């Protein structure tokens, strides 16, 4: 049996922390732009992700980079890799 555990490039996205009320978990809002199929106008689309924040270091308004991981719970399968920009206090 061959070993198929190659180093795959994990998905990483950047987003803004909109909630840090849970213990060791933050909600990250990820915005992207998609082109409308018929009219060609670029439209903003957003997704909310639950990400693991082991140190409870993230505050609301921080811009963070998150990466995909194996599921930790029903809704949490992302992990905070780094805080890019801190929110103004």
Curated annotation (Swiss-Prot):
Q: Which Gene3D superfamilies does this chain map to? A: Nucleic acid-binding proteins (2.40.50.140)
Q: Does the keyword DNA repair apply?
A: no
Alphabetical keyword list? Ribonucleoprotein, Ribosomal protein, RNA-binding, rRNA-binding
Q: Which GO terms describe its cellular component?
A: cytosolic small ribosomal subunit
Superkingdom to which the source organism belongs: Bacteria
Which terms does the UniProt entry file under GO BP? Answer: translation
Q: Which GO terms describe its molecular function?
A: rRNA binding; structural constituent of ribosome
Give a short account of what the protein does: One of the primary rRNA binding proteins, it binds specifically to the 5'-end of 16S ribosomal RNA.
The cross-references to HAMAP family, in alphabetical order and at most eight, read: Ribosomal_uS17_B (MF_01345_B)
Instruction: Return the similarity comment.
Output: Belongs to the universal ribosomal protein uS17 family.
* NCBIfam families in UniProt: PRK05610.1, uS17_bact
PANTHER family reported in the protein's UniProt record? 40S RIBOSOMAL PROTEIN S11 FAMILY MEMBER (PTHR10744), SMALL RIBOSOMAL SUBUNIT PROTEIN US17M (PTHR10744:SF1)
Quaternary state and interactors: Part of the 30S ribosomal subunit.
Protein name stated in the entry: Small ribosomal subunit protein uS17
């Amino acid at each position: 049996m061959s070993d198929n555990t190659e180093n795959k490039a994990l998905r990483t996205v950047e987003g803004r922390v909109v909630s840090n009320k849970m213990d060791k978990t933050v909600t990250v809002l990820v915005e992207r732009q998609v082109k409308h199929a018929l009219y060609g106008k670029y439209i903003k689309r957003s997704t909310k992700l639950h990400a693991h924040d082991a140190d409870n270091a993230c505050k609301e308004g921080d811009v963070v980079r998150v990466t995909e991981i194996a599921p930790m719970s029903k809704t949490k399968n992302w992990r905070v890799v780094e805080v890019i920009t801190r929110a103004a206090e």
